Amino acid sequence: MSSCVEKSRGRNPYAAVQVDPDSDYITPGTLDLEQLFWSGPTAQYAHVNQVWPRIYLGDEKTALERPALKDLGITHVLNAAVGKWNNVLTGADYYTGMNIRYLGVEADDKPTFNISQYFSQAAEFIHEALIHPVLVHCVMGRSRSATLVLAYLMIKEHLSVVDAVEHVRQRRCILPNHGFLKQLRALDIALQEEKLRLKRKDE
C-alpha cells in the first residue's frame, strides 16, 4: 500500500481527482478536504470518544489512566506519539498486568512527517483488535491518532476519505495537519485505483 501512496503523492495535491470515470465519486483536493473539518456541526472536544464500534480515539490523559481503560474494557492500545518530544511516554511495560496488547509508532505531528508509512501496520493492529475495544491515541487525540483511525476506516472498512472524515468528526473534534491530509488523500486515490483495477479485471 505504501508504494501506491507514494505514486499518488506525486500528483497535484490541490486538484480534485476522479479515478473511475463511471463513478460519481471524486477525491477532493487537499484544501477542499481541509474545509470538511470547518463545515457543519462537529463534536465538542473530550478526552476520549468512541468513533467506530469498539474504536476509542483519545488523548494522553486517557492513555495514562489505567482504571479508565479498564472501565472501557480496552484490550489494545495504539500509541501514535512514541518519543521524547510532544509525545506520550507509556510503552508496553506501562500496561503490565492489564492484559493489554500495545503498539507504539514514532510519529511527529509535523506536515512534513511521513505518517503513511504506518497506515498498513496500524490498520492491521486495529483490525485484529476489534473483537474487543481498542484505544488509539496521541497527545491530544486530534491529528496523529486521528489520521491512523481515518486510514483504518479507508483500508479496512472501505470508506472514502470524505466519508471517513465526516464520520469521525461528528464523533470527535479532530484536525489532522495539512501534510497528513495530503497523505490521506493520496491513500484515497490509491484505494480508488485498486478498486477500479479489480472492477476492470472482473469485466
Swiss-Prot record:
CC terms in the record's Gene Ontology section: cytoplasm; nucleus
EC nos: 3.1.3.16, 3.1.3.48
GO biological process: negative regulation of MAPK cascade; protein dephosphorylation
Tyrosine-protein phosphatase domain location: 47-193
One Pfam family from the record: DSPc
Residues forming the catalytic site: 138
Keywords: Cytoplasm, Hydrolase, Nucleus, Protein phosphatase
MF GO annotations: MAP kinase phosphatase activity; protein serine/threonine phosphatase activity; protein tyrosine phosphatase activity; protein tyrosine/serine/threonine phosphatase activity
Primary localization class, coarse: cytoplasm
Binding site for substrate: 137-144
Domain of life: Eukaryota
Catalytically driven reaction(s): O-phospho-L-tyrosyl-[protein] + H2O = L-tyrosyl-[protein] + phosphate; O-phospho-L-seryl-[protein] + H2O = L-seryl-[protein] + phosphate; O-phospho-L-threonyl-[protein] + H2O = L-threonyl-[protein] + phosphate
Location of the protein in the cell: Cytoplasm; Nucleus
InterPro entries (alphabetical): Atypical_DUSP_subfamA (IPR020405), Dual-sp_phosphatase_cat-dom (IPR000340), Prot-tyrosine_phosphatase-like (IPR029021), Tyr_Pase_AS (IPR016130), Tyr_Pase_cat (IPR003595), Tyr_Pase_dom (IPR000387), TYR_PHOSPHATASE_DUAL_dom (IPR020422)
Homology family: Belongs to the protein-tyrosine phosphatase family. Non-receptor class dual specificity subfamily.
Described function: Dual specificity phosphatase able to dephosphorylate phosphotyrosine, phosphoserine and phosphothreonine residues within the same substrate, with a preference for phosphotyrosine as a substrate. Involved in the modulation of AMPK and MAPK1/2 signaling pathways.
Protein name (Swiss-Prot/TrEMBL): Dual specificity phosphatase 29
Source species of the chain: Oryzias latipes
Upper lineage: Eukaryota, Metazoa, Chordata, Craniata, Vertebrata
